[in-house]
């Protein structure tokens, strides 16, 4: 056992328990997520049979009405979130023997981190969209304003970002840091984050590489602050503004405020996977990673 400083707190590094706890948590994670997503699907089916929404799980990705698709997907994602939070509460209480808030939920002094995360996601997608327009990779078609769909998507991505960040950064990375140095911990947790998206539609090696890099990007602040609000805000903003600017998100085609035509699917524009499946996204993430590392390193000092 050795000791290290994170911020102003002294933490114990256990070379065995941390990494083992992190890796073994993957199995119950998939069990809980599958079980609770099943509840979400069941509720959506009930609403479908009662004619409240048009939902048939066998044709889930073929739902013609975008509103119904978003309602069903939002329901499923919030059940997913409940499952993740319940699992982590159990693990923190009975395995880690720590308060649940130690995952990184303290809001004290973190408003600026939330603003920074939301702003960076917007800037990343706005600049990426503009560059692709100027390069002739995509062609603007028009706007498709629908406030209810925008609200549903924002709520949906809140659930997605909290669930994924709380598990991957709040639990997996937190435990890995008890066993390994920050670089190794970031690499392992980011590989897990990337592989969680392995079965997404239209995924390819460029997309998985970018998701790995994004995992490091999202984890840098946690290494220095042990707080989740910046990665949650950046993850939320990244997903939300990606679809607002017309891109698919992690291979999923959904409602977009801006509509454009992809001239030709390639690794410059990301094709059917979305902007995060592009070389441009990788470049932006690497640049942002460097500046965030400098920023939070200075913050920690």
Report the location of each language-model feature.
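Membrane-interface helix/loop boundary segments of multi-pass membrane proteins
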Residues: 163-188, 220-227
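Hydrophobic alpha-helical transmembrane segments
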Residues: 68-83, 159-163, 266-286
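Small-polar-interrupted transmembrane alpha-helices in polytopic inner-membrane proteins
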Residues: 125-128, 157-161, 182-198, 212
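Hydrophobic core of alpha-helical transmembrane segments in multi-pass integral membrane proteins
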Residues: 28-34, 81-91, 122-128, 281-296
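Single conserved hydrophobic/aromatic residue that forms the stacking wall/gate
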Residues: 1-12
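C-terminal membrane module of polytopic membrane proteins
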Residues: 45, 240-301
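Juxtamembrane helix-loop-helix connectors linking adjacent transmembrane helices
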Residues: 42-75, 96-166, 173-178
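Functionally important transmembrane alpha-helices
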Residues: 35, 207-266
């Amino acid at each position: 056992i050795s000791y290290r400083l994170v911020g102003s707190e002294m933490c114990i590094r256990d070379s065995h328990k941390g990494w083992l706890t992190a890796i073994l948590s993957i199995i119950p994670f998939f069990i809980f997520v599958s079980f609770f997503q099943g509840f979400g699907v069941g509720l959506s089916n009930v609403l479908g049979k009662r004619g409240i929404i048009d939902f048939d799980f066998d044709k889930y990705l073929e739902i013609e009405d975008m509103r119904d698709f978003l309602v069903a997907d939002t329901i499923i994602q919030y059940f997913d979130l409940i499952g993740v939070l319940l699992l982590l509460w159990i693990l923190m209480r009975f395995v880690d023997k720590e308060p649940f808030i130690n995952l990184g939920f303290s809001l004290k002094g973190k408003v600026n981190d939330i603003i920074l995360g939301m702003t960076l996601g917007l800037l990343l997608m706005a600049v990426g969209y503009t560059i692709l327009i100027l390069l002739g990779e995509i062609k603007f078609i028009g706007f498709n304003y629908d406030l209810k769909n925008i609200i549903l998507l924002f709520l949906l991505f809140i659930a997605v970002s909290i669930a994924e960040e709380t598990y991957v950064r709040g639990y997996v990375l937190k435990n890995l840091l008890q066993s390994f140095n920050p670089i190794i911990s970031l690499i392992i947790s980011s590989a897990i984050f990337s592989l969680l998206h392995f079965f997404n539609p239209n995924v390819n090696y460029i997309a998985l590489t970018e998701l790995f890099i994004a995992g490091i990007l999202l984890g840098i602040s946690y290494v220095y602050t042990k707080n989740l609000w910046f990665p949650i805000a950046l993850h939320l903003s990244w997903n939300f503004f990606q679809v607002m600017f017309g891109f698919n998100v992690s291979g999923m085609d959904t409602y977009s405020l801006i509509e454009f035509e992809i001239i030709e699917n390639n690794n410059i524009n990301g094709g059917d996977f979305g902007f995060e499946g592009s070389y441009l996204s990788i470049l932006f993430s690497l640049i942002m990673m460097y500046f965030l590392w400098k920023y939070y390193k200075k913050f920690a000092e």
